[in-house]
Amino acid sequence: MRIAIVGGGLAGSLAAAVLTRAGYRVALIDKRAVYPEEFRVEKLGGQQVDILRRLGLLDAFANEGCTFDTTLNIRRGKVVDISRTVNYGLHYAPMVAIARRLIADPSSLIVDQVLKITPSDDLQRLTLASGNQVVARLVILATGMAGAIPYSLGIKRRVIVERHSLALGFTIAPADGAEFAFSALTSYGEQAADGIDYLSIFPIRGGMRANLFMFRDPNDPIMREIRREPKSTLLRLIPGLRQHLGDFKVIDRVQSWVMDLANVEGHLQPGVVLIGDSFQTSCPAAGTGVSRLLVDVERLCTVHLPEWLTTGGMGTEKIAAFYSDRDKIASDEFAFRMAHFRQALTADAGVRWDLRRRLHFLRRNLRHRVDAIRPGWTGRLAGMLRA
């Protein structure tokens, strides 16, 4: 009996890849045979790389992404520190395409639209726009922020912070056709009133990609200015960039993405489980969205689902085990904490957060200076203190 996955974005496609490679029969249902270009996550790193490696999927992303392992971090034009971790830059649609190619059985993809799900303690019935039906033991909802199907099941989205953050993306290049003096760069906002968390510049197919993360009202006139005159507006908001970028040009249109912080209620139902943004959204600036998605995929597809399928039925007692998984809960809670922390550290002009902001960057810079003299010393000291 099949497992049905509704939604063929990154979460659904990765779940299908993990399950089919483990020998399970899967129906991945999405109305698009080829996922369209969308501005979403454009970089993989840190915990995401670790989980993809454990799942046996990393090489496919590493082979197609632009690899970089050194990021220069600056604020007000001065070096804060240097990050040395492996990252891969690639657009969201190619990420989804890679995940779909990793599906062991290509016939698992059904290009259709789910109109209705009839759940039960035993079998789940999905009615498709084509008139066909799919019967499955379990339905994995990976529909992202599209709420029609969850809503039809009585699952409601609860907005915790409306329009919490903004992400903008565009591609830049040196005006003289040469190369930038860095492999990747992060420039943090220079004053709280601007609401700029950071600008991340990294390599991607087609040039150097710039992702700007802000805590501003989407209707603020500055948004229109960034879209119309991205270069001049960026240099006005982050003047310290000029000495590191030199003369540059923006070579494509500015894309944007507004994110609400939200989760769901009414989700504990027989035969249906939600993963990724379908269950909870994350702040793009915090960089926790794909990490959460991957934790969901790993815990569901390698731990809980194999256990569920050893016995009959798919009641709420099984589904509840996933939602109460300690790793999942920790990941979800960390994402919300980081969302609020990044906003306060970036845009709270109060005395407390102004002091905390100064100390945050001072500590990072001091560690960087000490490590330049005695490489690895601060890391060893931190390890001894934790022990």
Regions found by a protein language model. Give the residues of each.
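Beta1/beta-strand and adjacent pyrophosphate-binding region of the FAD-binding site
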Residues: M1-A11
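FAD/FMN-dependent oxidoreductases across multiple families
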Residues: P218-T310, M314-G315
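Conserved N-terminal glycine-rich FAD pyrophosphate-binding loop of Rossmann-like flavoproteins
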Residues: A33-R53
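Conserved Rossmann-like nucleotide-cofactor binding loop
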Residues: A11, V34, A146
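Conserved N-terminal helical subregion
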Residues: D50, R54, F61-I155, V159-S165, ...
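C-terminal helical "tail/cap" subdomain of flavin- and related membrane-associated enzymes
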Residues: D247, T302-A387
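Glycine-rich FAD pyrophosphate-binding loop
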Residues: V6, T20-R40
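Conserved FAD-binding catalytic core of PHBH/FMO-like flavoproteins
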Residues: A142-L241
